[in-house]
From Swiss-Prot:
Enzyme type, top EC level: transferase
Protein name: Protein-L-isoaspartate O-methyltransferase
The entry's keywords: Cytoplasm, Methyltransferase, S-adenosyl-L-methionine, Transferase
Keyword 4Fe-4S belongs to the record: no
Stored SUPFAM superfamilies: S-adenosyl-L-methionine-dependent methyltransferases
Active site feature: S162
Length: 315
């Protein structure tokens, strides 16, 4: 290159080829700034690759700083996993058992009814009533799987829900093939027996002396929307004179005898069913009392049973 040409073109041809790439990276910079950047790029070749890596050029060399963007997308790749789509799957186990139990409870009740029939309960209306009432709704959730076993289960406050066989037996004795108009239950408890009675009687009156159980029975019965049950908080030994006389009275607690007030509230021809015996439960007997005249009652002793004691007053 001649001296005159060198003055006009102070840069070599190779430098002129690289200058546009540098000017593309830093748009808006002057020719003088671009010219001064070229020697620096020649001294440090790796620095030239930085713009290439930023623009995603395919010619980035291995072992240079172009390897850094390879790790940069990783946070972006992890972002879709952060919502954890497995979370809804974790909820499935808690829902499935409850749903499965709800679907099978009807069949479990049917098997319970078959056992009742095999044990001597013959009144179809009683069997239908036992099949219609979901007993698992009246016990604690932890005991729901045992709801249709023939067992008494605790409901709190030292009280129990009676065995299905005992509930069916007492209601069948109270009915004696009749259509019941007005029934009084002493000892509402969790409300299960009242719910069964509501299927065989026009009106059911039930008294509970323990306030928390009275409130619990109301909550248990509310989803069933039973229109013919009237719950009362009070002393069961006194009965409910304002609603007497009753076609049937069912007492769900054992006393040494049947309170006279309850005998007086029984209609002529009515039947009272109650466990009678010591509070220890060793000598309790299911007893049937029939009112045959205004001042005459007939008593029959039937089955050995075990009930919580019949107490007076309210708590």
């Amino acid at each position: 290159m001649s001296g005159e040409r060198a003055k006009r073109f102070p840069l070599a041809l190779e430098d002129l080829k690289r200058a546009p790439r540098k000017s593309e990276v830093r748009s808006g910079s002057g020719e003088r700034h671009a010219a001064s950047a070229v020697p620096k790029a020649a001294d440090k070749p790796a620095a030239v690759l930085k713009p290439v890596a930023k623009t995603g050029a395919a010619r980035a060399l291995p072992g240079t700083t172009a390897a850094k963007p390879a790790t940069a997308p990783k946070p972006n790749l992890l972002k879709p996993a952060m919502p954890q789509p497995a979370a809804p799957k974790l909820a499935a186990p808690s829902i499935a058992p409850a749903g499965a139990f709800a679907l099978t409870s009807e069949r479990v009740r049917e098997r319970m009814v078959e056992r009742l029939r095999a044990n001597g309960v013959t009144d179809a209306r009683v069997l239908d009533a036992m099949a219609a009432v979901p007993r698992h709704m009246f016990v604690d959730p932890g005991l729901a799987t045992q709801a249709y076993e023939d067992a008494a289960l605790p409901i709190g406050h030292q009280q129990t829900i009676s065995k299905p066989s005992v509930v069916a037996r007492m209601i069948e004795l109270a009915m004696a093939g009749r259509t019941l108009e007005r029934v009084l239950e002493i000892g509402t408890g969790c409300g299960y027996q009242a719910a069964v009675l509501s299927h065989v009687a026009r009106d059911v009156y039930s008294i509970e002396r323990i306030k928390p159980l009275y409130e619990r029975a109301k909550l248990n019965l509310r989803p069933l929307r039973v229109p013919n049950i009237r719950l009362h908080y009070g002393d069961g030994r006194v009965g409910l004179p304002s609603a007497a006389p009753f076609d049937a009275i069912v007492i769900a607690a054992a006393g040494l005898d049947v309170p006279q007030a309850l005998l007086e509230q029984l209609a002529i021809g009515g039947r009272l069913v109650a466990p009678v015996g010591a509070q220890s439960g060793q000598h309790q007997v299911l007893t049937l009392v029939e009112r045959v005249a205004p001042a005459q009652w007939r008593e029959s002793r039937l089955d050995r049973v075990f009930f919580v004691p019949l107490k007076s007053g309210v708590i």
